[in-house]
């Protein structure tokens, strides 16, 4: 008797999180949910939606993706929403100069899918419809994602951008699942010493570092302090910090601040 594999078992484990920061229209949240469910992705996180949540106007454009909307999670900040995300991508149409590494959508999906297969959590962050993500938002991500579209008309509805991410993700997932040997790789956890740190742990480190640098007088110019802080974040994010890296950095901070327990 031919053995069949139940792909539904792996849908959650092999899916990313879609994070909408300050979405303005409930209708766009609904159409985003529809785009996600088209490709079996149901992890929707909402950060400060303008019209609040839940929002009944989202259900009509969702066209049946009610389950995605009903299980969507609401957060007060990007840092709160991404606490358990170990690899975060910020989608942006504008070229940034803040130092965050940029990848094409194709490279981003390849890298992110490999990360999920190895037990990590991946998130794709989208900004408000009119303004997009701010520099302070983008600097929280490990990478920015660029989508190759017409430079003379680069306007994408947020649900269209989500659809492209989900489409590319689904292509690589289906290709992966065609090979039975790949099933043994699913949920294979990386060793703790090499696993990428999650955004919540990194955020805690940045706060500790910020406090130490502030006390030392490092931010001598209050006008430039926000820019310098973003640059510092970008510097560390480019290093793809592991849990062990963070433990080492916390040890350095404790030593420099005189709070180390070592004698």
List each model region and its residues.
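Post-transcriptional modification and biogenesis factors for structured RNAs
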Residues: 1-263
């Amino acid at each position: 008797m031919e053995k069949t594999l139940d792909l539904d078992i792996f849908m959650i484990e092999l899916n990313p999180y879609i994070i909408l920061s300050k979405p303005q229209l409930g209708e766009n949240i609904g159409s985003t949910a529809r785009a996600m469910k088209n490709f079996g992705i149901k992890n929707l996180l909402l950060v400060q939606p303008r019209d609040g949540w839940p929002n009944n106007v989202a259900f009509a454009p969702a066209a049946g993706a009610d389950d995605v909307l009903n299980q969507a999670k609401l957060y007060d900040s990007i840092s709160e929403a991404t606490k358990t995300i170990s690899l975060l991508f910020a989608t942006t149409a504008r070229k940034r100069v803040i130092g965050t590494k940029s990848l094409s959508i194709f490279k981003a999906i390849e890298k992110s899918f490999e990360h999920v297969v190895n037990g990590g959590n991946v998130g794709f962050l989208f900004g408000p419809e009119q303004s997009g993500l701010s520099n302070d938002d983008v600097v929280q991500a490990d990478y920015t994602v660029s989508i190759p579209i017409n430079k003379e008309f680069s306007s994408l509805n947020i649900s269209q951008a989500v659809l492209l991410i989900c489409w590319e993700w689904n292509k690589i997932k289906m290709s992966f699942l065609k090979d039975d040997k790949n099933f043994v790789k699913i949920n294979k956890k990386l060793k703790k010493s090499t696993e990428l740190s999650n955004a919540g742990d990194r955020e805690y480190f940045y706060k500790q570092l910020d406090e130490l640098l502030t006390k030392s007088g490092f931010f001598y110019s209050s006008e430039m302090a926000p820019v310098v802080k973003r640059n510092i974040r970008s510097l560390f994010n480019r290093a793809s910090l592991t849990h062990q890296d963070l433990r080492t950095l916390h040890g350095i901070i404790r030593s420099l601040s005189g709070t180390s327990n070592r004698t």
